[in-house]
Amino acid sequence: MGKYNLILSEYLSFVYNSQSAVQIPIYYSSNSELEKRCIDFHVKCVDYSKRGLSLKSLFEEYKDVIDDATLLSILSYSYDKYNAVERKLINYAKGKPLEADLTVNELDYENNKITSELFQSAEEYTDSLMDPAILTSLSSNLNAVMFWLERHSNDVADANKIYKRRLDLFIIVASTINKYGVPRHNEKYRYDYDVMKDKPYYLVTWANSAIEMLMSVFSHEDYLIAKELIVLSYSNRSTLAKLVSSPMSILVALIDINGTFITNEELELEFSDKYVKAIVPDQTFNELQEMIDNMKKAGLVDIPRMIQEWLIDCSLEKFTLMSKIYSWSFHVGFRKQKMIDAALDQLKTEYTDDVDNEMYYEYTMLIRDEIVKMLEIPVKHDDHLLQDSELAGLLSMSSASNGESRQLKFGRKTIFSTKKNMHVMDDIAHGRYTPGVIPPVNVDRPIPLGRRDVPGRRTRIIFILPYEYFIAQHAVVEKMLSYAKHTREYAEFYSQSNQLLSYGDVTRFLSSNSMVLYTDVSQWDSSQHNTQPFRKGIIMGLDMLTNMTNDPKVVHTLNLYKQTQINLMDSYVQIPDGDVIKKIQYGAVASGEKQTKAANSIANLALIKTVLSRIANKYSFITKIIRVDGDDNYAVLQFNTDVTKQMVQEVSDDVRYIYSRMNAKVKALVSTVGIEIAKRYIAGGKIFFRAGINLLNNEKRGQSTQWDQAAILYSNYIVNKLRGFETDREFILTKIIQMTSVAITGSLRLFPSERVLTTNSTFKVFDSEDFIIEYGTTDDEVYIQRAFMSLSSQKSGIADEIASSQTFKNYVSKLSDQLLVSKNTIVSKGIAVTEKAKLNSYAPVYLEKRRAQISALLTMLQKPVSFKSNKITINDILRDIKPFFVTTEANLPIQYRKFMPTLPDNVQYVIQCIGSRTYQIEDSGSKSSISKLISKYSVYKPSIEELYKVISLREREIQLYLVSLGVPLIDASTYVGSRIYSQDKYKILESYVYNLLSINYGCYQLFDFNSPDLEKLIRIPFKGKIPAVTFILHLYAKLEIINHAIKNRAWISLFCNYPKSEMIKLWKKMWNITALRSPYTSANFFQD
């Protein structure tokens, strides 16, 4: 057992260091004799500790338990009330506390004033501007740091340098906090007015960020960056991140490309040894200098100095430092503004009549034409999705807020809820459901707002529109997206591509006679000037489409969509400002519609096309690619002569002038070698990602539990690490220890062991080895997995009561009746289960399930209930396979060049040996014929789990299933009788297994699993034709080899002689694999 359990026991003796503290380890074993000893051992431990005796003699007596059984958890018992943090903190509070400069930020409340100066009373107070929104406390964070420092105070050599750097930074944090006292959190991990009133308002969120930064310090450069950001972010809560990260958009244009990867015709990355010189006009350097001067004005010293030193020779080797600075800048935390300021921000731009109306007209027409192009085919063919758009919308209705709280009756139960799905049910039950009427959002019914906070940017507002808007838009937007899926211009949606493909797209056409124009249009998307041309373009497109069909249902769908656009042209929003709710006319486009992403992409594409058509009046060039990715767009232009400084300058000036003619306040740049957009940046022909995920501050509070957040924390740590920002792993493990502990009483806590948290059960939180997903196959591992499966699904009385009410039942049967032609229990049950699952977002249901889960967990962590589960997990399959594999050492040379410099060494090594992949492996089953058949006739989308279940049924049952979903009998029987059906069986099983093995997450998504280099390390003699078995054997072998390579930087070869008799058994088993959902899998999903 790894490091975790060691850290756990050390951490417990660090935190509970008084005389009264006792730690009782609890063991379990799958061996029944040993299990009896485990139980005796536990009973005696509890008895001894009650009598105040030392447990040492027991550890001797039960050595067999400690050596051969598995640690399940540690029971910790302590009378100590928590002033421990303060006591320990004093030892570090040796420095000068920071003093906040109260004039740095434009908005008064963004200055780090004492809370009582910002909020006169508890009634006025809100923590929403500084809430860390994470279920762990500042005192825990401080404890985790001090624990690390104490553990490493005797380190030598380089390790000692790291210790000194971190200690030095922690002294700043400790001294500042100590001056005011450690703020105590309440039971919801929030900081109340009476705790904060005599302390600086941003103390907690600043300290969390500071701790996250100092625990990510390794080198001297890290130390300098961290120190500067920690000190300055104490005062500057508004613009620091923006200042520090601004130069990157220019830096990417300064490095020559000497060898790069390009996307070839097969959509694979292929090395190209081309050399492209960075052509940089003087004005660009002036702009960069201005940015650096602004940094200096804000008090930064070391960071601008590092940038200036790098500018001397602009080398790619030292560029990693630039990318480090860029990543670090996000870790100062989220900028959280008041809603009123976030909303007024968009309304500040004043109208000018001095705009180029021709350009606006062209822009609108391009939007119109694109909308028509996207929807033309489905409309002309009277696509069933557009006919049954309302049903499709209801089936995928989310359980997010509908903007207002209503009193709802479900049977005898009356509840208050804001959730869309509940409102829909209630409206249907009371005859208030009128999807054909889109409610206005004018001055009489202003839109309530949500918020989106990001580091380094202003807070943005989000419309919370009534559910009618979702229903009206859903089907049409789905069709728009499926068009975008096979259109390369839409980088974000393009079929199964990933960021690497988009990278190769850009580098492909860079040469001495081309330049790339890249623009950040986030300001334009939310500007008032965009609104009318944007909505009108969409409306005109819909009008043209309406004339292309005679189907009244399709016309109705298009008209409803049109109505949403008309309503939103006259939109008002409601903003709480102190006690009053202000109504403000809001003339801009905001997120919150179903169409937001798709429509913005269309608009941004239209925008760059408009600009390029103007540029084309003056220059002659070929547009090699145009791409739009979220808020950014970019294009590569190829001229017929080599590019000169003067050309770059002129094109740049012209582009900026053209944008200004449309009053678009955007950041447009021209370069010959690289681009920088929100999602990724390309410099020196290599691709970089910003490692800017905050660990100890969250954007908002959801309804995830401490366990979920521990998994999310780990998952964020992994993503950052892949992108080049590494936080100390021991610190992360310490946070997991804290966040997964369960309080039994005030003085009793239970801490789960590594085995519990890393086995893939419903409780999995992290991997014992970074980047490697292990599937336990030992007796003890399978035993504990089975034990956890027995208590995975928890009941909720409230949910059951709602689900048994007439309102709920009627809704579910309404959906089933509209969807199904004939009875189909799988689908009806599926709908009921889905609708019931949506109730989880209603807090009381969630809490109830959670409590049941915790109490079951507590029982389990004290003594696992052995239980024979008939469920088969992926572990069982791998366990059956494992014994038949023989390992030998092998050798695989490095043969690919690096293209992602920020990757950790071990991951980089594996990619350099076997290559990378530029596609997502299909793990949803959507590529199978049955899935396509269903979507041809029905709006129902079965999940991969359901397809997996259905495809293994008898042929007659599959046929009935298809017919009930509206597939004509002839098609259904043809399908079942054809070879396609047996191919599907294999395809779906494949997708399902990929899905279970999280092949598209973590670092596995970077590896080429079909690499011939990998294949040649595997030898499996061909026996019998069971492709599914061959598939799983190969996949297992690949994972084993890759995991071994990540761990040891060495290759192994696997030989498997799988007996024919076992193959059939295995094949049968493979059709009964249960999927396990855990905090770990949902954290992976959350990353997506």
UniProtKB/Swiss-Prot annotation:
GO molecular function: nucleotide binding; RNA binding; RNA-directed RNA polymerase activity
Enzyme class: transferase
EC number in record: 2.7.7.48
Compartment(s): Virion
UniProt keyword annotations, A-Z: Magnesium, Nucleotide-binding, Nucleotidyltransferase, RNA-binding, RNA-directed RNA polymerase, Transferase, Viral RNA replication, Virion
InterPro entries, per database record: DNA/RNA_pol_sf (IPR043502), RNA-dir_pol_4-hel_dom (IPR042032), RNA-dir_pol_luteovirus (IPR001795), RNA-dir_pol_reovirus (IPR007097), Rotavirus_VP1_C (IPR022071)
Statement: the UniProt record of this protein carries the keyword Nucleotide-binding: yes
Cellular component GO terms, alphabetical: virion component
UniProt key word Acetylation: no
Main location: virion
Annotated catalysed reactions: RNA(n) + a ribonucleoside 5'-triphosphate = RNA(n+1) + diphosphate
Required co-factors: Mg(2+)
Domain called RdRp catalytic: residue spans: 501-687
Record-linked PROSITE patterns: RDRP_DSRNA_REO
Biological processes per GO annotation: DNA-templated transcription; viral genome replication
Sequence similarity: Belongs to the reoviridae RNA-directed RNA polymerase family.
Record's subunit section: Interacts with VP3 (Potential). Interacts with VP2; this interaction activates VP1. Interacts with NSP5; this interaction is probably necessary for the formation of functional virus factories. Interacts with NSP2; this interaction is weak.
Role noted for this protein: RNA-directed RNA polymerase that is involved in both transcription and genome replication. Together with VP3 capping enzyme, forms an enzyme complex positioned near the channels situated at each of the five-fold vertices of the core. Following infection, the outermost layer of the virus is lost, leaving a double-layered particle (DLP) made up of the core and VP6 shell. VP1 then catalyzes the transcription of fully conservative plus-strand genomic RNAs that are extruded through the DLP's channels into the cytoplasm where they function as mRNAs for translation of viral proteins.
Protein name as annotated: RNA-directed RNA polymerase
Organism of derivation: Rotavirus A (strain RVA/Human/Japan/YO/1977/G3P1A[8]) (RV-A)
